[in-house]
Regions:
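Conserved Nudix-box catalytic region and its N-terminal flanking loop in Nudix hydrolases
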Residues: 42-45, 54, 62-101, 143, ...
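Conserved hydrophobic "DFG−1" position in protein kinase catalytic cores
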Residues: 55, 65, 135-136, 161
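Acidic/glycine-rich phosphate/pyrophosphate-binding loops and surrounding catalytic core
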Residues: 110, 115, 121-123
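Nudix hydrolase/Nudix homology domain
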Residues: 2-12, 67, 77-83, 116, ...
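Short loop segments at secondary-structure junctions
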Residues: 31-32, 57-60, 69, 137-141, ...
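Active-site-adjacent beta-strand/loop module that shapes the phosphate/pyrophosphate-binding cleft
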Residues: 27-34, 123-145
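Acidic, metal-coordinating catalytic segment for phosphate/diphosphate chemistry
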Residues: 16-60, 74
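Beta-rich strand-turn-strand
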Residues: 92-97, 106, 110-112
Length: 196
Protein backbone atom coordinates (compact mmCIF):
# COMPACT_ATOMS: atom_id res chain seq x y z
CA UNK A 1 0.00 0.00 0.00
CA UNK A 2 1.56 3.27 -1.07
CA UNK A 3 0.98 6.40 0.93
CA UNK A 4 0.62 9.84 -0.63
CA UNK A 5 3.56 12.11 0.05
CA UNK A 6 2.80 14.66 2.73
CA UNK A 7 1.97 18.12 1.43
CA UNK A 8 3.83 20.26 3.91
CA UNK A 9 5.19 23.80 3.86
CA UNK A 10 7.52 24.94 6.64
CA UNK A 11 6.47 28.51 7.51
CA UNK A 12 9.16 29.16 10.13
CA UNK A 13 11.84 27.33 12.11
CA UNK A 14 13.56 28.21 15.37
CA UNK A 15 16.43 26.38 17.06
CA UNK A 16 15.62 25.94 20.75
CA UNK A 17 18.70 23.94 21.73
CA UNK A 18 21.76 22.73 19.86
CA UNK A 19 23.74 20.38 22.12
CA UNK A 20 24.18 16.64 21.69
CA UNK A 21 20.89 16.75 19.79
CA UNK A 22 19.23 19.72 18.16
CA UNK A 23 15.74 20.75 19.20
CA UNK A 24 13.79 22.91 16.75
CA UNK A 25 10.35 24.47 16.82
CA UNK A 26 8.47 24.61 13.51
CA UNK A 27 5.41 26.44 12.30
CA UNK A 28 4.01 24.53 9.33
CA UNK A 29 1.11 24.32 6.97
CA UNK A 30 -0.02 20.97 5.68
CA UNK A 31 -2.93 19.79 3.59
CA UNK A 32 -4.94 17.13 5.39
CA UNK A 33 -6.82 14.16 3.90
CA UNK A 34 -9.90 16.31 3.28
CA UNK A 35 -7.89 18.92 1.36
CA UNK A 36 -7.98 21.57 4.09
CA UNK A 37 -4.84 23.46 5.07
CA UNK A 38 -3.93 23.10 8.74
CA UNK A 39 -1.40 25.32 10.54
CA UNK A 40 0.50 23.55 13.29
CA UNK A 41 3.34 24.23 15.69
CA UNK A 42 5.59 21.23 16.38
CA UNK A 43 8.92 20.58 18.07
CA UNK A 44 11.38 18.11 16.55
CA UNK A 45 14.56 16.57 17.96
CA UNK A 46 17.09 16.16 15.16
CA UNK A 47 18.94 12.97 16.04
CA UNK A 48 21.81 11.29 14.22
CA UNK A 49 20.84 8.02 12.47
CA UNK A 50 21.85 4.84 14.27
CA UNK A 51 22.31 1.12 13.71
CA UNK A 52 21.83 -1.94 15.90
CA UNK A 53 22.66 -5.61 15.50
CA UNK A 54 21.74 -8.99 16.90
CA UNK A 55 24.78 -11.25 17.24
CA UNK A 56 23.55 -14.86 17.14
CA UNK A 57 25.64 -17.97 17.76
CA UNK A 58 23.66 -20.87 16.23
CA UNK A 59 25.96 -23.58 17.58
CA UNK A 60 25.32 -22.50 21.17
CA UNK A 61 21.85 -21.00 20.40
CA UNK A 62 22.68 -17.78 22.18
CA UNK A 63 22.81 -14.06 21.58
CA UNK A 64 25.41 -11.50 22.58
CA UNK A 65 23.86 -8.61 24.48
CA UNK A 66 25.33 -5.69 26.38
CA UNK A 67 24.43 -3.98 29.64
CA UNK A 68 25.09 -0.26 30.01
CA UNK A 69 23.91 2.80 31.92
CA UNK A 70 21.13 4.92 30.39
CA UNK A 71 20.44 8.26 32.10
CA UNK A 72 17.07 8.85 30.41
CA UNK A 73 15.80 5.53 31.77
CA UNK A 74 17.09 6.41 35.24
CA UNK A 75 15.26 9.75 35.05
CA UNK A 76 12.00 7.81 34.51
CA UNK A 77 12.66 5.75 37.65
CA UNK A 78 13.42 2.48 35.85
CA UNK A 79 16.58 0.38 36.26
CA UNK A 80 19.25 2.40 34.47
CA UNK A 81 21.57 -0.51 33.60
CA UNK A 82 19.74 -1.69 30.48
CA UNK A 83 20.26 -4.92 28.58
CA UNK A 84 20.45 -4.17 24.87
CA UNK A 85 21.77 -5.32 21.53
CA UNK A 86 24.98 -3.58 20.39
CA UNK A 87 24.14 -0.25 18.76
CA UNK A 88 25.51 3.16 17.99
CA UNK A 89 25.30 6.31 15.94
CA UNK A 90 26.40 6.26 12.31
CA UNK A 91 28.85 9.17 12.72
CA UNK A 92 28.77 9.83 8.94
CA UNK A 93 29.51 6.15 8.18
CA UNK A 94 27.41 3.79 6.09
CA UNK A 95 25.09 1.83 8.44
CA UNK A 96 26.97 -1.46 7.93
CA UNK A 97 30.35 0.18 8.59
CA UNK A 98 28.97 1.80 11.72
CA UNK A 99 27.49 -1.39 13.13
CA UNK A 100 30.68 -3.36 12.45
CA UNK A 101 32.59 -0.70 14.40
CA UNK A 102 30.09 -0.68 17.25
CA UNK A 103 29.99 -4.48 17.51
CA UNK A 104 33.77 -4.58 17.86
CA UNK A 105 33.92 -1.70 20.36
CA UNK A 106 31.08 -2.98 22.53
CA UNK A 107 31.48 -6.78 22.33
CA UNK A 108 34.90 -7.54 20.84
CA UNK A 109 33.33 -9.58 18.02
CA UNK A 110 34.64 -9.32 14.47
CA UNK A 111 31.69 -9.74 12.10
CA UNK A 112 32.11 -12.05 9.14
CA UNK A 113 28.82 -10.76 7.77
CA UNK A 114 26.21 -8.21 8.73
CA UNK A 115 22.83 -8.80 7.13
CA UNK A 116 20.55 -5.76 6.84
CA UNK A 117 17.01 -6.53 8.00
CA UNK A 118 15.01 -3.29 8.05
CA UNK A 119 14.99 0.31 9.22
CA UNK A 120 12.49 2.10 11.41
CA UNK A 121 11.74 5.37 13.16
CA UNK A 122 11.53 4.56 16.88
CA UNK A 123 9.63 7.74 17.79
CA UNK A 124 8.40 9.45 14.59
CA UNK A 125 6.12 11.88 16.39
CA UNK A 126 9.01 14.06 17.53
CA UNK A 127 12.42 12.58 16.67
CA UNK A 128 14.13 12.38 13.25
CA UNK A 129 16.28 9.37 14.24
CA UNK A 130 16.13 6.37 11.93
CA UNK A 131 17.61 3.08 13.13
CA UNK A 132 19.03 0.43 10.77
CA UNK A 133 18.61 -3.15 12.03
CA UNK A 134 21.11 -5.93 11.29
CA UNK A 135 21.79 -9.54 12.26
CA UNK A 136 25.07 -11.45 12.18
CA UNK A 137 25.77 -15.14 12.71
CA UNK A 138 28.84 -15.43 14.93
CA UNK A 139 30.98 -18.06 16.60
CA UNK A 140 33.07 -17.86 19.76
CA UNK A 141 36.18 -17.74 17.52
CA UNK A 142 34.96 -14.38 16.17
CA UNK A 143 35.58 -12.73 19.54
CA UNK A 144 38.97 -11.15 18.98
CA UNK A 145 38.91 -8.45 21.67
CA UNK A 146 37.43 -7.86 25.11
CA UNK A 147 34.85 -5.26 24.07
CA UNK A 148 33.28 -3.19 26.81
CA UNK A 149 33.24 0.14 24.97
CA UNK A 150 35.73 2.94 24.53
CA UNK A 151 37.42 4.56 27.52
CA UNK A 152 37.59 7.93 25.73
CA UNK A 153 33.78 7.85 25.35
CA UNK A 154 33.42 6.87 29.04
CA UNK A 155 31.61 3.68 28.05
CA UNK A 156 31.22 1.01 30.72
CA UNK A 157 29.67 -1.93 28.88
CA UNK A 158 29.22 -5.46 30.19
CA UNK A 159 29.13 -8.18 27.50
CA UNK A 160 26.50 -10.88 28.09
CA UNK A 161 26.04 -14.31 26.50
CA UNK A 162 22.36 -15.19 26.80
CA UNK A 163 20.58 -18.29 25.42
CA UNK A 164 17.93 -17.11 22.95
CA UNK A 165 15.05 -18.73 24.84
CA UNK A 166 16.25 -17.12 28.08
CA UNK A 167 16.39 -13.73 26.34
CA UNK A 168 12.75 -14.23 25.31
CA UNK A 169 11.87 -14.89 28.96
CA UNK A 170 13.78 -11.74 29.96
CA UNK A 171 11.39 -9.75 27.76
CA UNK A 172 8.39 -11.41 29.41
CA UNK A 173 9.63 -10.77 32.96
CA UNK A 174 10.65 -7.17 32.26
CA UNK A 175 14.44 -7.55 32.42
CA UNK A 176 14.75 -6.52 28.77
CA UNK A 177 12.68 -3.42 27.96
CA UNK A 178 14.63 -1.73 25.17
CA UNK A 179 12.54 -1.52 21.97
CA UNK A 180 15.30 -2.25 19.43
CA UNK A 181 16.42 -5.26 21.47
CA UNK A 182 12.89 -6.62 21.76
CA UNK A 183 12.37 -6.20 18.01
CA UNK A 184 15.57 -8.05 17.10
CA UNK A 185 15.01 -10.84 19.63
CA UNK A 186 11.47 -11.38 18.36
CA UNK A 187 12.82 -11.42 14.79
CA UNK A 188 15.38 -14.06 15.83
CA UNK A 189 12.75 -16.21 17.52
CA UNK A 190 10.66 -16.14 14.34
CA UNK A 191 13.67 -16.83 12.08
CA UNK A 192 15.88 -19.07 14.25
CA UNK A 193 15.79 -21.99 11.80
CA UNK A 194 16.96 -19.75 8.94
CA UNK A 195 19.95 -18.66 11.02
CA UNK A 196 21.18 -22.18 11.82
Amino acid sequence: MTQPKSRVKIVSAETLSNGWTKLSSYLLDYIDRKGATQRLKREVYHRTPAACILLYDPRRDLVILVRQFRLAVHMNGDPAWMIEVPAGLLDDDHPEQAIRREAMEETGYHLRDARFLFKCYPSPGAITEVVHFFVSVIDIADRVAEGGGLDEEHEDIEVLEVPLDEAAQMIENGEIFDAKTIMLLQWALLNRNKLR
